[in-house]
Regions:
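Active-site-adjacent loops and short helices of periplasmic peptidoglycan-processing enzymes
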Residues: 1-67, 74-80
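Domain-terminus/edge residues, biased toward the C-terminal soluble/receptor-binding domains
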Residues: 46-50, 61-242
Length: 242
């Protein structure tokens, strides 16, 4: 059994035995590992969390919030090993046993399109209900989704359905909007030492911004930061930024 096996077994199928084995191996005891968890939580700004065990099961004084979980996930995703595991749907352990991500197990029953969920971790307790954190893709952008307190009704895991509903909502209501066209005149500046008195500043290409489809164009403000005049020496050079 390897550390990699334990990491995959902890994250993909939510193996409580794997998390406890890691705790003993890395910190010599569950309590020591919990202390390490709380120390790191404070370090990364998780002000409304306190951990008592390494399994996530309900117990007195063990709690967190969705906003704190977002901080934790953003921090963890900076680690390439974690990100690789988090975005894996299925993995073969060194003993040949195959472990699947819980969303894949859910979907064996629900038969939904989960291809846009790039990575995920689910959980359940009586107090928190069905939970999920995920990275998903919409219109070539990646987003983090975290929810709690979902239900299981008639074969439907609503933490997964909620995630898919959010993806559909983003697909329909948000996209890359052309906020400034390359043909738009940003600013007109004088040209020195030339028979051409002025130059119209344009973008080199259209500016695309991810916004709601019904965004108000009057809310878009364009600021130019660059040269206030040019000469022939500036030909084919960048003269500023927008």
């Amino acid at each position: 059994l390897t550390y990699k096996d334990l990491l995959y077994a902890s994250i993909l199928p939510s193996g409580a035995d794997a998390t406890q084995a890691l705790a003993y191996s890395l910190s010599r005891s569950i309590n020591n590992f919990v202390n390490d968890m709380n120390t790191l939580a404070k370090k990364i700004g998780m002000k409304n969390s306190n951990f008592v065990n390494v399994t996530g099961l309900d117990i007195d004084n063990h709690y967190s919030t969705v906003s704190d979980l977002l901080k934790m996930l953003q921090y963890a995703l900076r680690n390439e090993t974690f990100k690789t595991i988090y975005t894996t749907k299925s993995y073969t352990l060194s003993n040949g046993l195959v472990v699947d991500a819980t969303v894949k197990k859910y979907n064996n029953l629900m038969k939904l399109d989960i291809s846009r969920i790039i990575g995920s971790k689910t959980g359940y307790t009586n107090k928190a209900g069905l939970c999920i954190s995920s990275i998903f893709e919409s219109n070539n952008h990646e987003f983090i989704f975290i929810s709690t307190n979902a239900e299981f009704i008639y074969g439907n895991y609503y933490n997964l359905k909620d995630n898919l509903n959010i993806i559909n909502f983003m697909d329909k209501n948000y996209n890359n909007q052309t906020t400034v066209k390359s043909t738009d005149i940003i600013k007109t500046i004088p040209v020195n030492f030339s028979n051409i008195p002025k130059y119209d500043v344009h973008l080199s290409k259209d500016a695309l911004t991810y916004l709601p489809n019904d965004y108000n164009k009057d809310d878009i403000k364009v600021n130019y930061n660059g040269k206030t005049s040019i000469t022939f020496l500036d030909n084919n050079k960048q003269i500023g930024k927008v």
